[in-house]
C-alpha cells in the first residue's frame, strides 16, 4: 500500500500559537524529518549497491517547507535536483514514489517512468492524448534537468507566460487566473556562476515578470568554495546593481538563513505576495545552508571541508535548529520531537523497502519465467553445454536487474543460433516481449504520438489562380504570419529586431503595428533566454515563434534546445510538451558569421524536435502552417539569400500545409538522383539545367525536412530508377550529406540498387570566406555539381 501524500497547505503561519498553528508547524517539521531520512536512506542504498546514484536535498528542508507555504494552485516550478522537501511539502510525491525513482523503477516512478535519476520531478501538463490539463487548479512542476542553471531560462519563460496572460486574460482558460501565477526557480549557489543565471536575471529585470529565484547557498560547488565562484562571495551582493529602487525596474532581493523557520515563512510569504501583484522578479538568497551528507553519493565532503565547517554544519543543521525553536516556543517537548523523528525514520525505511520490493518482485516473476525457458531449451538441446552455464549464472544472482534477465536470454539465444525447436521459439517470444517492453519504457515519446502530432496534420495543397501575384519571398512569409496572428490569439513572435522593424529580413514587417507590442516584440541579445521564453510559454499553452537571428548564432541557444526542449516529452514520459517554433535563417550569404549551415551539429543535438529546411519562403510558410496545428517543437531554417527572390503567392497562404518528412521531386530524370535541401536546391537546379543542355537528365529531390527524413522513401524510389546518387549540401564533410546517405543507402536499403559508388558533395572544412569570391571557394557551386554528376556517369562509361 502506498502511503498518502502530504495534505495540501491550508493554514498560513500568521496565527498566534494555538492548536492550528502548532499542528501546521508539526506538519512542516515532520516533512523535514521524513525528507532527511529519505536522504540518509538514499545515500545508503547507493553505497551498498542497491541503487545506482543518489543526489539529495539534505540541509535544505526548512527553507523548502517555508517556500511551500508561499505557493498557490496554478504556480509553476523550474527547479533542480535538491528540491525533494518542497515536493513532499506540496503533496506531489510519496516517499515510495521517491524511492521508486531512486531504484530506477519505470512502473513506480510517476515523474519520468524510470528515465531520470532520483530527485527529478514532473507533474502532468498534458494527458495521454495530448490534451492540456487544468494548470490553474494544481501545483505544476516542469520536468527537471541536471545541467547546472539549465532550469533558469525555462523558469523565465514560465514567468513570462504569466505576464502575457495578465495582459490578455481572455485566453487564460485552464492555464491562468489573471496571470497571478509565480514561476518558482531553485538553484544551487555555485550554479549562479553560469552565464544562463545572469542572462536570466537580467532578462527578468528587463521584462518585469513574476520569477522567484531561490538560491540555496551552502558555500560550495561540489568541493570548490564560493570564494572561487562568486564576486564578493555573495550572489545577493553581486546582484545588488539590479536591485529595484522603488520604481518599476530591477529585481527585489531578499536574504534569509536556512535554519530560521519562522523568519523564512515570513520572508517567502511577504515577498511572494508582493510579487503576485507587482510582477517584479525576486531573488531569495538563502544563506548558511548545510549539506550533512555531502554533494552526492559519488564523494565524501569530509575530503574538502575543514573541521570548523563540519562543526558548523552540525550546529546549524536546519532540522536541529527548527526542533530547538519549537521547544523554546512551547510548540513541542523534546520527547515529542524525538517521537516525530523516530516515526519518520520508520516510515521512510518502510517506504524504501516497499519501493525496492515493488521493482524486484516484478523482476522475480520474470526470472522464474526465464528459468523455465532455459530449462526447456536445455532439455531440447542437451548438446549445447553453454546453456547450463548461462542458467547457473542467472541463478547465482540473488536479485538481478531486469536488464540482466534480458542479457541472459539473448546470450542463450546466441548459443542456440544454429538450432531450431519449440523451446527455442518460446525463448524467442520471451526476448521479443521484453525487448518490446524495454523499447516502450525507454524509447517512446521522443516526439508526439498524439492526434496532434505534426505528422498527423492534414495536407492542404497550395492553390494558385491566374491572378496569383508575384511577391518577394519575405512578403509571402508576411502574408502567412498575418493570417496566423489574425486567427490565433495565443500566437506570439519575438527575438532580436523582430518587433519594431519586423525582423532583419522583413518577414514580420508591419505585424507589431497591426497586432501590438504585446504579441510581436523585440528582445535583447540573449539567445539562451529567448529559447527559454519560448519553452516556458509553450509549456503553458501559448504558441511562441522565437527567433534566432542567424543560424550562426544558434550555438548561444543550443543548450536549452538540446537539454531542455528536445528532451521534455521524453524525460517526462509523455506528461509534458512544449510546441515551440524556433525560427532562424542560414546557409549561404557572405562572410563567416552569416553563412553558417551547421546541420550536422543540429542533427546530433536536436533529436526531439523537427528540423525543417525549406528551399523558399512558400515552403517555409506551409511548414509554419503545419507546425502551428501540431504539438511538436520544431526549428525552421529559412534560406538567408532568398527573401528578395520572387515567388507566387498562394491564395490560401494561411491554410495550406507542407507535410513534414515528405520530399518533393522537382525535376525528373533517369540517369542520376540528386538529393539536397535548403539553399542548395537553387544551386542544384541551376546545375541540372546546364546538364540538361548536354542531354543528362538528373532527378532532383528536395528533402524539405531533415527530421523527419523521407518517410515515404521517395529517395529510394528514385534510386531504383537511376542507380546513381549524389547528396549535396553546404555543411561540412560527415554532416547532413552523410546523414542523408546513411538514411537512403542503409535504412532504406538503397545500396542494393547502386551501379556506381554514392557521392557526397559538401563545403570545405573551414568557415565561409567573405564575399562572393569567398563563398565560391568555400561552398559547393553549380560547376561542382555538374562535375560530380558527370564523373558519376563517366565512371560508368555513360558520359
Outline where the language-model segments fall.
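Short beta-strand segments
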Residues: 79-81, 149, 186-187, 214-217, ...
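Conserved acidic/glycine
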Residues: 1-63, 69-70, 291-294, 298-515, ...
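Thiamine diphosphate
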Residues: 61-62, 140-398, 404-405, 492, 510, ...
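Active-site phosphate/pyrophosphate-binding segments
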Residues: 576, 586-590, 594, 599, ...
